[in-house]
Swiss-Prot record:
Region called Disordered, residue ranges: 128-159
Domain of life: Eukaryota
One Pfam family cited in the UniProt record for this chain: KxDL
Name of protein: KxDL motif-containing protein CG10681
GO biological process: lysosome localization
Stated family: Belongs to the KXD1 family.
Ranges of biased composition (kind: Low complexity): 148-157
Gene Ontology CC annotation, any one: BORC complex
Amino acid sequence: MSHLGLADVHQSEDATPDLESFTGFGNSAAEAFIQSLAGMVNQGDVETMIRAQKQMLQRFEKTNEMLLNCNALSQSRLKSASEDFKRHVKCLSEMKKDLDYIFRKIRIIKQKLQSQFPAIYAEVQPQRSSLAEEAEDDTEAQAKKTAETPAPAAAKPVLSTKKSAATIEYVQMEEAVDNGTVEIENELIKRVCSVETANPNDSSDCTSEDTG
């Protein structure tokens, strides 16, 4: 009976393997699964993927650095452009004020001339359009002639009938306003002021502000 009992014990031990023999090397089931899975993966492919990821990371870092530099440059350029724009807007507003002042003075002078010399003003008024057209035609002819010939050609003078001193001053004033010549305009304003000063019936004065 003792021999049979020992034989049964040996058979039971042989039929049930231990944990170490099942998993191998005394590792747990999870570790054994991971090792088996790692053995199925090619290590060369894994290293290639890691290198590709590192290269892409470096490219992304360089791209981010370039974008940061571009943003900084754009901000500096925008700041300088904004300052220039504000300065130009301020300059244009000042120029508009000056032009408003000049045209207001011109209207005042025209009203004075109309009140002092109504007959001459009515006679000269229809000639404004013809004088402007003649000046425009002369300008176009001069530009065309200059384009055709290399040598500069002298412009033809505009002939006008001299009615009186006040009429001449008025016609020259209109030409100066049309051409936008500031120096001639100031000189003509001085002449008109001298004509007004010579007239004893006119109580208005002409200061240096009129020529400003």
